[in-house]
Amino acid sequence: MYQPDFPTVPFRLGLYPVVDSVEWIERLLEAGVRTIQLRIKDKRDEEVEADVIAAIALGRRYDARLFINDYWRLAMKHNAYGVHLGQEDLETTDLKAIQAAGLRLGVSTHDDMEIDIALAAKPSYIALGHVFPTQTKQMPSAPQGLAQLVRHIERLADYPTVAIGGISLEHAPAVLATGVGSIAVVSAITQAADWRDATAQLLAIAGVGDE
């Protein structure tokens, strides 16, 4: 049963771009996206704080669900909608502080064991990946494919889920057909020949999520 220790999110978060700059946040919110993540890697908090502040302000302006990847202290300090953490971050993060601050929590998973770990944290949503081969980041695990994704979705039937990893415009309908609540995309938008057109098509397929 879906009873997270953190504030709930809609079962369907819709199209969920993951981007590395405030510029992309602004572009995509203007284009109609309503769930989005700022993922800046390998910088100190003081180096990214201005970007986090700007992204959160944009999220509020567009009434969007803006998640901050990794920088949970900054997300708490500036009252973001939510935080997204990888498995490697769970042990070093003060989850109770995030919960007390009223932020939503998303957690990445790559296999059954990591799903068990995520469920123990009782997050707002669980991300399942990587579905297809991806060039966006180095992955120690193998792509799961659609059959494995279906199995995980069946296990997490009443939990908000997000599929991520190598999801292209062409793959999107088949991924959503598994019953997953949302699709997270990176290069399908940021490396598209026409990002506006790609975003519009993906929004038509995945929607903006439930209210």
Swiss-Prot record:
**EC number(s) for this protein?**
2.5.1.3
Q: Which Pfam families match?
A: TMP-TENI
Named cofactor requirement(s): Mg(2+)
Q: Which UniProt keywords apply?
A: Magnesium, Metal-binding, Thiamine biosynthesis, Transferase
Q: Which organism is it from?
A: Salmonella paratyphi A (strain AKU_12601)
Annotated positions binding Mg(2+):
70, 89
- Quote one Gene Ontology molecular function term: magnesium ion binding
Taxonomic lineage of this organism?
Answer: Bacteria, Pseudomonadati, Pseudomonadota, Gammaproteobacteria, Enterobacterales
Asked whether the UniProt record includes Zinc among its keywords, one would answer no
Membership in a protein family: Belongs to the thiamine-phosphate synthase family.
Please tell me where 4-amino-2-methyl-5-(diphosphooxymethyl)pyrimidine binds in this chain.
37-41, 69, 108, 137
Name this protein carries in UniProt: Thiamine-phosphate synthase
Cofactor binding description: Binds 1 Mg(2+) ion per subunit.
> Which residues hold 2-[(2R,5Z)-2-carboxy-4-methylthiazol-5(2H)-ylidene]ethyl phosphate?
134-136, 166, 186-187
| UniProt keyword annotation of Magnesium present | yes
Q: What does this protein do?
A: Condenses 4-methyl-5-(beta-hydroxyethyl)thiazole monophosphate (THZ-P) and 2-methyl-4-amino-5-hydroxymethyl pyrimidine pyrophosphate (HMP-PP) to form thiamine monophosphate (TMP).
